[in-house]
Swiss-Prot record:
Keyword annotations of the record: Cell inner membrane, Cell membrane, Membrane, Transmembrane, Transmembrane helix
Species the sequence originates in: Aeromonas hydrophila subsp. hydrophila (strain ATCC 7966 / DSM 30187 / BCRC 13018 / CCUG 14551 / JCM 1027 / KCTC 2358 / NCIMB 9240 / NCTC 8049)
Similarity section: Belongs to the UPF0060 family.
Gene Ontology CC entries for this record: plasma membrane
Cell location: Cell inner membrane
Name of the protein this chain belongs to: UPF0060 membrane protein AHA_2410
PANTHER family (UniProt xref): UPF0060 MEMBRANE PROTEIN YNFA
Length: 110
């Protein structure tokens, strides 16, 4: 799988996971409708299915995906929660993305 396709798949996967966790959070902490649990469950099912689309070892995918998840979570903090990330949030996200790139795109023996 190409680098761009892998990154796109990681981004969509992270959004599905974050949405699947954010909706129950709204229900539990802000008194929103219990019906939010339905799209949350569907989002988490989508998340699990998306993880299965990666053609490499599952452990490597999960480790690399964590870097993208950190980046998307900080982006969510800014765009959805309305909290501007600190310099250290941004630095940490970049470090996580560098780790993801090393894990996913390093040369491997066939």
């Amino acid at each position: 799988m190409g680098e761009l396709k892998t990154m796109g798949l990681f981004l969509v996967t992270a959004l599905a996971e974050i949405l699947g966790c954010y909706l129950p959070y709204l229900w539990l902490t802000q008194g929103r409708s219990v019906w939010l649990l339905l799209p949350a469950g569907l989002s988490l099912m989508l998340f699990a299915w998306l993880l299965s689309l990666h053609p490499t070892a599952a452990g490597r995918v999960y480790a690399a995906y964590g870097g993208v998840y950190i980046f998307v979570a900080i982006l969510w903090l800014w765009l959805v929660d309305g909290i501007r990330p600190s310099l250290w949030d941004l630095v940490g996200s970049l470090v996580a993305l560098c780790g993801m790139a090393i894990i996913m795109f390093a040369p491997r023996e066939a």
